[in-house]
């Protein structure tokens, strides 16, 4: 499926081919791909029509694939806020080096041809062929199933993740996009489902999924999440749908007449919900840097991210920056599974928090669990959260005794409750009836969960628990325990440690 990204989904709104010549550029965001150090480039540019947000994407053979110009004021404001005010502003290049200047000049000369190829039927057919190709010589295309927003692996058309647990640099919005991608009720572009055909070029989802997506983006409290929200809900104006049981034809005769009627869920479209961005519209002067700037005489102070990177790499400069600011990282490193980005670190405490969240992933993958309102093993789980086998919760409690829960995640542990279930053979199963292996679940009070609950209260009373940084998903949510824990801890470290980290 794939959440339609802010800068990629707007392809439907691209205007006709006009010559674009930006006079000045700033806020350059570069991301490499395997085989190409310049896989994507995003920047603010000023042309004859005013300030705009430009995006370009190349393949591993350095061929320009996609080029986008977007001049919605909300998107420009969000991108500018991300560049100027966020702790991750060091990922942006303000003064391009020689290599980046050459890339900008080449892009400028190819811009019109790139847009013509996108608008032509031949170009559309080539893109579809690329997406559907599975030949061995196109392995890099299978690995990158769609274009994503720089710094994310799930926000865009398709995703670029190697596995389901991998997240990009912008962990928060990427987590939201990944959860939205897993919505069980969707209608793909130009497909028929739930009694209606989606004539749009974007997937539409159930309204509950869109509501959770918007809530997740709001809870991040950063500009890249606002960019996603503004694009998806305000610019693209993608509707959602609700399902209602109605009488409809459930079986058709071969000549087209209805053979049988029955109750079936049918989709009813609802208008999109407006996204209110959370960034502060501060009155700041904006002066784009010239495309061919003079080298600065005042090198910036080396940040701790680069200091850390030097311990593992012999590379000291990059070709996309001027020597004056070569100490600043110019490319967003790709997120690795299980390894948090430096921007979210706060020493060993963060690593411990990440390990604890990973322990919840094992709980989510527990083989024996009963989902909310589900009857399994002859037991109805009437609660609004999953009920797990006692072996799974006992393993979690044993781990948490060695690794204290992350500060601020109280509500996540509250959702676990203090009960679990055991499996026992049925007592009234007579021999020869084929039910000797049929077990029934017995709900019991878990002493190990009660001890965990008391321990959590003890830490909170001592003041080490901290305040909850953001609301977790409401009971009954489909978001996993691991995702909720990761979402909370990332918000905590972002608010408490990022500014100190990047300013040191």
UniProtKB/Swiss-Prot annotation:
Positions of region (Disordered): 115-143, 285-350
Positions bearing carbohydrate: 163, 276
Alphabetical list of Pfam families matching this protein: Phospholip_A2_2
Catalytic activity reported: a 1,2-diacyl-sn-glycero-3-phosphocholine + H2O = a 1-acyl-sn-glycero-3-phosphocholine + a fatty acid + H(+); 1-hexadecanoyl-2-(9Z,12Z-octadecadienoyl)-sn-glycero-3-phosphocholine + H2O = (9Z,12Z)-octadecadienoate + 1-hexadecanoyl-sn-glycero-3-phosphocholine + H(+); 1-hexadecanoyl-2-(5Z,8Z,11Z,14Z-eicosatetraenoyl)-sn-glycero-3-phosphocholine + H2O = 1-hexadecanoyl-sn-glycero-3-phosphocholine + (5Z,8Z,11Z,14Z)-eicosatetraenoate + H(+); 1-hexadecanoyl-2-(9Z,12Z-octadecadienoyl)-sn-glycero-3-phosphoethanolamine + H2O = 1-hexadecanoyl-sn-glycero-3-phosphoethanolamine + (9Z,12Z)-octadecadienoate + H(+)
Entries under PANTHER family matching the protein: RH14732P
Record text about domains: The phospholipase A2-like domain represents the fully processed form after N- and C-termini are cleaved off. It is the secreted mature form found in biological fluids.
Protein name (Swiss-Prot/TrEMBL): Group 3 secretory phospholipase A2
Source organism of this protein record: Mus musculus
Gene symbol of the encoding locus: Pla2g3
